Amino acid sequence: MSQSTATYINVIGAGLAGSEAAYQIAKRGIPVKLYEMRGVKATPQHKTTNFAELVCSNSFRGDSLTNAVGLLKEEMRRLDSIIMRNGEANRVPAGGAMAVDREGYAESVTAELENHPLIEVIRDEITEIPDDAITVIATGPLTSDALAEKIHALNGGDGFYFYDAAAPIIDKSTIDMSKVYLKSRYDKGEAAYLNCPMTKEEFMAFHEALTTAEEAPLNAFEKEKYFEGCMPIEVMAKRGIKTMLYGPMKPVGLEYPDDYTGPRDGEFKTPYAVVQLRQDNAAGSLYNIVGFQTHLKWGEQKRVFQTIPGLENAEFVRYGVMHRNSYMDSPNLLTETFQSRSNPNLFFAGQMTGVEGYVESAASGLVAGINAARLFKREEALIFPQTTAIGSLPHYVTHADSKHFQPMNVNFGIIKELEGPRIRDKKERYEAIASRALADLDTCLASL
């Protein structure tokens, strides 16, 4: 198939991946037609018509370079990521993590793209894969049915999907502050989380209520397949009585403050379990329940979660919801630039490619956008080194075993190993990987 001669590039979908792709293309001097159906047609999970809306958590996760997603974010900053730049401008306290005011952040991304002289925003639903120009499809897990059918056909009709869920958001003014305390785990960074401590008795009662609560139904023909990093809390609880204690309710590093007077198990300095609440907006008036993605019926959410100490009278401004995420057989369908193997004018980006997470989705849009622009200019494709996070992630999702392919977060395990003797100390090893990654990325960019 010959390269398109159109004078613009299409980007379908203005989520994190599409917004990033559109920006990267436009900053290289190429006109973009950015299509977004919200405003004309709603989705079940989105609440606004803003671009890059965060429908699950408001966290971009860890910010340290000894964390793989922290490394990926730093690489994206060096590549002038619109998502990272606007995220930084709308940060809210989150200890050692990066969290944002979800409304302010999405509004700022939207304004920047709508006001860009080379980006034409078109509010319309796309039902066919365009063939008029180089195109980046970044319609996300909530792709409309008509377009999803066309993408599904590229998959050979195989159904790749999983479920993920969002956590509830509550009104801070309705939290009983006498029963909670402010602290970040291990006192890392500023004290940024409200902690709801539980005794063993309280935890056991909560576990019983959670595991017997009624879930919202799935379609009868669909199996319950969940992404491990966004598993509903009730599913986690049913895996074992202590599973949550090693997950979102882990108490380690969240010792009681000296002035705590509430119930505790004997003289223990650490609660048996802790539910953490994270600030969700810049004003600090909304908090989400960390790690409590759920598919319970709304009435059940209120009943069960109001048994958490401090939340007895909590008002929920948004209940948790679950949605079906479809993704592609990327190892067979895409190259490392997220370019279609069968149609070089077609790129994909975001969760549909098999990357999982806000940051990873934006990173895939960055890679796809840069390479769509380079194709437009008839330049050689840019494949980032496998020693970097932004190079290892697309390499993984396009070279994994197709038979067992599952969505993947960025992690140090997919980055090329260090040469020489293995560094035994994990923190030092990750620091060395990060240092090499940033040096290799800088070298790569300097050669362009």
Swiss-Prot record:
The protein's matches in SUPFAM superfamilies, at most eight in alphabetical order, are given as:
FAD/NAD(P)-binding domain (SSF51905)
> Is Cytoplasm there in the keyword field?
yes
Gene3D superfamilies membership: FAD/NAD(P)-binding domain
Q: Which reaction does it catalyse?
A: uridine(54) in tRNA + (6R)-5,10-methylene-5,6,7,8-tetrahydrofolate + NADH + H(+) = 5-methyluridine(54) in tRNA + (6S)-5,6,7,8-tetrahydrofolate + NAD(+); uridine(54) in tRNA + (6R)-5,10-methylene-5,6,7,8-tetrahydrofolate + NADPH + H(+) = 5-methyluridine(54) in tRNA + (6S)-5,6,7,8-tetrahydrofolate + NADP(+)
Location of this chain's protein in the cell: Cytoplasm
Which keywords has UniProt assigned to this entry? Cytoplasm, FAD, Flavoprotein, Methyltransferase, NAD, NADP, Transferase, tRNA processing
Q: Which PROSITE patterns match?
A: GIDA_2 (PS01281)
Q: What does this protein do?
A: Catalyzes the folate-dependent formation of 5-methyl-uridine at position 54 (M-5-U54) in all tRNAs.
What is the primary gene name for this protein?
A: trmFO
In its UniProt entry, the species of origin is given as: Streptococcus pyogenes serotype M6 (strain ATCC BAA-946 / MGAS10394)
**Descriptive protein name:** Methylenetetrahydrofolate--tRNA-(uracil-5-)-methyltransferase TrmFO
> Which molecular-function annotations from GO does this UniProt entry contain?
flavin adenine dinucleotide binding; tRNA (uracil(54)-C5)-methyltransferase activity, 5,10-methylenetetrahydrofolate-dependent
